[in-house]
Amino acid sequence: MNLFSSLTLVTLILLTMPIAAINFNTHKFTNYPLYVKTTISCAFITSMIPTMMFIHTGQEMIISNWHWLTIQTLKLSLSFKMDFFSMMFVPVALFVTWSIMEFSMWYMHSDPNINQFFKYLLLFLITMLILVTANNLFQLFIGWEGVGIMSFLLIGWWYGRTDANTAALQAILYNRIGDIGFILAMAWFLINLNTWDLQQIFMLNPNDSNLPLMGLILAATGKSAQFGLHPWLPSAMEGPTPVSALLHSSTMVVAGIFLLIRFYPLTENNKFGQSIMLCLGAMTTLFTAMCALTQNDIKKIIAFSTSSQLGLMMVTIGINQPHLAFLHICTHAFFKAMLFMCSGSIIHSLNDEQDIRKMGGLFKAMPFTTTALIIGSLALTGMPFLTGFYSKDLIIESANTSYTNAWALLMTLVATSFTAIYSTRIIFFALLGQPRFPTLININENNPFLINSIKRLLIGSLFAGFIISNNIPPMTIPQMTMPHYLKMTALTVTILGFILALEISNTTHYLKFNYPSNTFKFSNLLGYYPTIMHRLTPYMNLTMSQKSASSLLDLIWLETILPKTISLAQMKMSTTITSQKGLIKLYFLSFLITILISTTLLNFHE
């Protein structure tokens, strides 16, 4: 077991070496990206040893090696939790990052700041592994904020573009709302349980855990782009494609789901929390799948697809299957990162063209990318015996056979059929038909960095699901029994989606509409959500503020403060100084009496 803990720490320490190396050398590294990529591949191979040991022995471990600080009875120490979740996720994250780093060497080769880009990606990976292996909430929060800030820096990588800056700001603001929930949960655990260690929280297992659970769900909603806080994920596609492939498909966006999986001992007996997660996940998966149907930007379609899969993971936790949600996280990382890399390959070859309407006929020009894209799409739709099938099919079966909300189940099934539609749409528009791009474009996909990186993820998309599902404890699981039609539901829904996709594409080809339908507008404009939240709400707030400010200015400054105050002050002053009281009748009467007396006296004197 000493070897187990040592090798795990070696994996984490290996990754910090390139960060330290670039600080020691004042001259510029010319081959720094290659150095980083090699380090990550070594870390991946090293991480496989403790993972294999864990699979073989099935023993969890907590490494606590540095006491941090003590606040009265709260003890904080640097501790790593090596359990099923972290031991399976670390190799997957390292493998995917290794491939994406190699892909970046091709994609970003002309960028003058490529060394800084690789340093950012490496820092992101380190913070992600801190998040995954953390044993207390404080350490988890460091990783949580770390991936957030690296996401901000990487989305805004091309800082000369307004869209990139806006998207980066949007990501950080939406995540900030989620962080409020996380801090609320941390405060609650500190006040009520006086601990931040995960196993102590689970042992104490508070009964009234609704408030911290709501905080954790809010945190997951922000980080994993669930409905309500979802617009930042499609906007994040303004960053470079390697960033989208690494952060916004396979690692960072699943951090919110991972947090809820970590806290499954609290959620498994909390029906209220489960219902919220189920409904939130079902709404997310349907809404984002619907938005993906009519997008024309290839990266936006894959981004909405990611958001839809995150909704599916949330549904899985909602039906009390956290381990299954985790399996889907691991399998999803392979083919989704590969889909982004294929889209990056196409975009790069077509001179940064992202509109699928301006592609077409690429199956002959880019055979390798085409193969990978089609296999990735099939894995995403849950094609039998590809990677996605092993988790997605199980999720649909579990949802079908569980005692759950029928509406949520129906929404999930419809969203699953939509997956087939938008996957077919990408293939149909980008790869088939006649070329719709300028003939002068020089298409070349024969770079070893590109081929090798996609090839590795392609093999992962074919076999990773089988390998992971056969090697994760528990090895012996009770076989689910169900009718044939129920077993075939997932496949039937997917096939129906394919047929529907072909019908829709034929309709749009041969039946041209003068005006787009309302449904199309709703889907294409993302359910009007960004328009309402980013335009209408601030506009109303600003106009109301302006009106209230101007009316208050008119009322208070221009009327009450100046004219009325001056007149009031003068009245006060005059009444204070003068002895006159304004009794006109009395004055006239006294005047009259005086005149009468004086005239009488005058007459009498004469």
Swiss-Prot record:
<dbReference type="GO" id="GO:0008137">
    <property type="term" value="F:NADH dehydrogenase (ubiquinone) activity"/>
</dbReference>
<feature type="transmembrane region" description="Helical">
    <location>
        <begin position="43"/>
        <end position="63"/>
    </location>
</feature>
<dbReference type="GO" id="GO:0032981">
    <property type="term" value="P:mitochondrial respiratory chain complex I assembly"/>
</dbReference>
<feature type="transmembrane region" description="Helical">
    <location>
        <begin position="213"/>
        <end position="233"/>
    </location>
</feature>
<feature type="transmembrane region" description="Helical">
    <location>
        <begin position="485"/>
        <end position="505"/>
    </location>
</feature>
<dbReference type="InterPro" id="IPR018393">
    <property type="entry name" value="NADHpl_OxRdtase_5_subgr"/>
</dbReference>
<keyword id="KW-0812">Transmembrane</keyword>
<feature type="transmembrane region" description="Helical">
    <location>
        <begin position="4"/>
        <end position="24"/>
    </location>
</feature>
<dbReference type="Pfam" id="PF00361">
    <property type="entry name" value="Proton_antipo_M"/>
</dbReference>
<dbReference type="GO" id="GO:0045271">
    <property type="term" value="C:respiratory chain complex I"/>
</dbReference>
<feature type="transmembrane region" description="Helical">
    <location>
        <begin position="582"/>
        <end position="602"/>
    </location>
</feature>
<feature type="transmembrane region" description="Helical">
    <location>
        <begin position="114"/>
        <end position="134"/>
    </location>
</feature>
<feature type="transmembrane region" description="Helical">
    <location>
        <begin position="457"/>
        <end position="477"/>
    </location>
</feature>
<feature type="transmembrane region" description="Helical">
    <location>
        <begin position="84"/>
        <end position="104"/>
    </location>
</feature>
<dbReference type="GO" id="GO:0015990">
    <property type="term" value="P:electron transport coupled proton transport"/>
</dbReference>
<dbReference type="InterPro" id="IPR001516">
    <property type="entry name" value="Proton_antipo_N"/>
</dbReference>
<keyword id="KW-1133">Transmembrane helix</keyword>
<dbReference type="Pfam" id="PF00662">
    <property type="entry name" value="Proton_antipo_N"/>
</dbReference>
<feature type="transmembrane region" description="Helical">
    <location>
        <begin position="301"/>
        <end position="320"/>
    </location>
</feature>
<keyword id="KW-0520">NAD</keyword>
<dbReference type="InterPro" id="IPR001750">
    <property type="entry name" value="ND/Mrp_TM"/>
</dbReference>
<feature type="transmembrane region" description="Helical">
    <location>
        <begin position="272"/>
        <end position="292"/>
    </location>
</feature>
<dbReference type="InterPro" id="IPR003945">
    <property type="entry name" value="NU5C-like"/>
</dbReference>
<keyword id="KW-0813">Transport</keyword>
<dbReference type="Pfam" id="PF06455">
    <property type="entry name" value="NADH5_C"/>
</dbReference>
<keyword id="KW-0999">Mitochondrion inner membrane</keyword>
<keyword id="KW-0679">Respiratory chain</keyword>
<dbReference type="GO" id="GO:0005743">
    <property type="term" value="C:mitochondrial inner membrane"/>
</dbReference>
<keyword id="KW-0496">Mitochondrion</keyword>
<keyword id="KW-0249">Electron transport</keyword>
<feature type="transmembrane region" description="Helical">
    <location>
        <begin position="325"/>
        <end position="347"/>
    </location>
</feature>
<comment type="function">
    <text>Core subunit of the mitochondrial membrane respiratory chain NADH dehydrogenase (Complex I) which catalyzes electron transfer from NADH through the respiratory chain, using ubiquinone as an electron acceptor. Essential for the catalytic activity and assembly of complex I.</text>
</comment>
<keyword id="KW-0472">Membrane</keyword>
<feature type="transmembrane region" description="Helical">
    <location>
        <begin position="140"/>
        <end position="160"/>
    </location>
</feature>
<keyword id="KW-0830">Ubiquinone</keyword>
<dbReference type="InterPro" id="IPR010934">
    <property type="entry name" value="NADH_DH_su5_C"/>
</dbReference>
<dbReference type="GO" id="GO:0006120">
    <property type="term" value="P:mitochondrial electron transport, NADH to ubiquinone"/>
</dbReference>
<protein>
    <recommendedName>
        <fullName>NADH-ubiquinone oxidoreductase chain 5</fullName>
        <ecNumber>7.1.1.2</ecNumber>
    </recommendedName>
</protein>
<comment type="subunit">
    <text>Core subunit of respiratory chain NADH dehydrogenase (Complex I) which is composed of 45 different subunits.</text>
</comment>
<feature type="transmembrane region" description="Helical">
    <location>
        <begin position="241"/>
        <end position="261"/>
    </location>
</feature>
<comment type="similarity">
    <text>Belongs to the complex I subunit 5 family.</text>
</comment>
<keyword id="KW-1278">Translocase</keyword>
